[in-house]
Amino acid sequence: MRFTIVIPVALCVLLIGLTAPAQRKKGYARKPKPLPVVSAIDTEALKGLITQPRERPLLVNFWATFCDPCRDEFPDLVKIDKDYRPQSIEFVTVSLDDFGEIKTSVPQFLVSMKATMPAYLLNVTDPEPAINFIDRRWQGDLPATYLYNEKGEVVYKHIGRVNTAELREAIEKVVKKSD
């Protein structure tokens, strides 16, 4: 009686084991995609990133994985990135997550959003100097979106979930001025 159960089970295990390598060769077993690189950035490097001379406007979005409005607006920002970055603007994101998230939840979130824009994580013990550099009136609320013209001047800012139509309008205006 035992053999009538053991033999069919053993045959099934053997067949599954023999077909697994064939499935891998056919591309059925996928390798996990590598996570995007999220670069650490400190206050001085952030200042340099924003103030460096550039040929195109710069869009910067400050966000965090623990921020619901940030997560909600991210698909819209990814669409804006795809529509404008290749030819019109530079676009970077700066996460204010804990530095320990640089290789885990931050890149995993970016993959889930299909984000391709350069990504940074603010690596400071005190974010106040970075926040004050960006905007003395900004209290650090997230998300925060800033659009800079080629001269490094803020031409659009929004604290909270961005209105996509307003942001697109601001991008169109600054791009037309730079042409």
Range-by-range predicted roles:
Residues 56-58, 63-66, 98, 141:
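Short pre-active-site segment immediately N-terminal to redox-active cysteine/selenocysteine motifs
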Residues 8-16:
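Bacterial N-terminal signal peptides
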Residues 37-58, 81:
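A short beta-strand-turn-helix
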Residues 141-179:
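Thiol-/selenol-based redox modules, centered on thioredoxin-like
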Residues 62-79:
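Conserved redox-active cysteine motifs that mediate thiol-disulfide chemistry
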Residues 88-103, 115-125:
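Thiol-based oxidoreductase modules, predominantly thioredoxin-like and allied folds used
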Residues 18-40, 51, 108-111:
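N-proximal helix/coil linker or "cap" segments that precede and/or mark the start of modular domains
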Residues 108-142:
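Short, internal strand/loop/helix patches
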